[in-house]
Amino acid sequence: MLLGLLCGYCSADAVVACPDPSVVTQPDGSTLTLLLHGDEWFSFSTTADGFTVVKDADDGYYKYVALQNNELVAGTIVAHDATMRTPVEKAALATTTRYLAPDAKTVAAKRAKRRLHGNTGRYDYKNFRGLVILVAYNDCPFVFDDAHTLFNDMINQKDYKGFMSNAQFPELIPYTGSVRDYFYSSSAGEFDPAFDVVGPVTINYSQYDARQANNAQALVEAALDAADSLVNYKDYDRDGDGTVDMVFFLFAGGGSNFSGNDSRLLWPHASTVLSKSLDGVRFGRYACSTELYGRPQSKIIDGIGTICHEFSHVLGIADLYDTDGTGSGGSSVTPGKWSLMAQGSYLNQSRTPCTYSAYERYAAGFSTPEKLNKKGTYIVNPITSSNKGYRLDSNTDNEFFLLESRKQEGWDAYLPGEGMLIWRVDSTNADVWEYNKVNCNPKHSYYQLLRATGGTTDSDADPFPGTGNVTAIDNTTTPNLCSWNGRMSDFGISEIARSADGSVSFKLAVQQYETQVEDFEDVKVDGSTVKGKFTTWTLKNNAKIAATAGENAGNGQYACSMLRSSELVSDTLAWEVNVFSYRFFNPTSSTSIVRTYYRQPGATAWTSLKDETGVETVTVRAGTNVKLLFTTVIPKGSEVRILEYTGNRTAPCYVDDITFVRPVEDKAIVGDLNGDGNVDVTDVTMLINAILGQIQIEGGDLNGDGNVDVTDVTSEINIVLGSQN
């Protein structure tokens, strides 16, 4: 069920804008560096430092935008690179917001049209045969005279090395492999696709008629008609359901997915042919890309990255970049160059797209990650050669972590770095996967790379240990292994080390937690103090334990009532707290503000706690209640303090269900040297290797004589024999 959710969406999907900057020439001869953002439904250009620009249709200059009727239009000031700006230009930009984007409602309306009902994903990989149609426009032929041979080799040839340029002195343009090579490698031989390449055919449309993807249906239908005499489309209904399994269109010329290009050009995407039948079969899913990489005048043949990205949509895999840009609350931090379904398709001018990740292999059915649930030392080998990853389930249903090793070799040669990547995969919301919104909300990414150093841009410090030498991750680190809802996982990872062969070893600890809840239902009140279930509470400034009144006044019969300036303070805690939460109920007609603190042992000052969203001062509107969650580790012996900072002076708010989650010590098993929870022959082997000096271990001195030697091996064998009897 989970796998079906991860790959079973239906929509029109596209490659993200190429992240490479482009230098354009203004009409006066000056140059301007541009960056493109978004996809075929939502895109805009900025200067290198983030000021949005558009091309003025009247004079051809790129100018800083102005907002007119919720539309971005060319303003009056010609754009320049930062070092070339005049004082007047700098003054105008001082009050200009960076990364101004198209109106979110307009983008949402366009996206609503994408919810189509086509066939996606799960082919019989052994019976697959795809169709690729080369399509020229009436004003744009292919650059190579023999385009068919060029692209047939690029798509189908085994162990493809590249092609010879058509320059006066031809040279090899090297590629890492063909489309076939890419999928054969990413599936570990499970999928060896064959594509019939036909054409080029010419359609009676201009390259500028595409209008990104807005007029794609007309172009696609024209291409199907033009190729009809060359193809029996029924041959590509491999499952016999009356619908062609897929068609890929490769259009001549450039694409609007590169900065500085005409926005009327086609934007590569995947979608559904809405209503077309030929040769007795209907058409369903299609995908398309363009011939050229970058600026069309450069005539650089595009690599295979865009084809692999768009064809992956046909296999049912969603986009993993932020598909609505600044909508849904702003721009999200996405996998970037670490994923084919984000910016990884563009690596090395798309000639070396990064390989499928553990998630993408899982979603396509190429590999199932091994679940880990026992403590121990594990090794994960580079996914390019092993096709393997590990899975750790969180304490939230349908949410888990994936671990994989990436090495800068083969398809991963152009990744930003190498080491172990850790991904959080959250499939608790079916809609975001079904409608291609996986990473739209910056406050809740459903597919998140846990970057080792907590960065937000692609770097060699993202993997573990990486250049940041980050060797551990657990529930209390940044990043951490908690669920999105703050629930702690039952494991921690430490001693992460990478070997020269690209393998990464790590130690997995299984951590148990105990939850303590104060609900004030059975407490003893003695003046200003309350003996609770796990600590004593001090009530200050009119705080008291009171019967709840109404639906929004607590959970149960009793809670701690609070007025403005009331405080609830704990005694010193007998244990470390990893997660602290409580509910604050405001049944009054006034807005309340609540703050939460802790004080470490021996300290006099209180430290303000930030909740899971990074907020110290939490506003609770009248008639509402909130759950405040804190993941800061509170040391043993600390106190906590809840303060109603502002609020009603006469009508009370209520604090209830104060919850502390604390770790329970994991008692070591004597003789369990590899930490897998068992004492067996593998521990004997580990001890012998330690005595020989091949490895270092803890707990090897089993007889307590201060040395680790052969006598400890005898002790270990006796423990093993005793555990088996």
What do these predicted regions represent?
Residues 247-250, 673-696, 705-725:
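Alpha-helical segments with a strong preference for the paired helices of cellulosomal dockerin domains
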Residues 143-144, 150, 160-174, 181, ...:
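Non-catalytic C-terminal accessory/binding modules of secreted extracellular proteins
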Residues 555-581, 589-594, 626-628:
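Short beta-strands within extracellular/lumenal beta-sheet-rich domains
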Residues 96-334, 338, 342-360, 431-432, ...:
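Active-site-proximal segment of zinc-dependent metalloprotease catalytic domains
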Residues 604-635:
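Extracellular carbohydrate recognition and processing domains
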Residues 235-239, 668-678, 701-707:
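Acidic, divalent-cation-chelating loop motifs in proteins
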Residues 646-663:
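Extracellular carbohydrate recognition
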Residues 513, 523-557:
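Extracellular glycan-recognition surfaces and repeat-rich motifs
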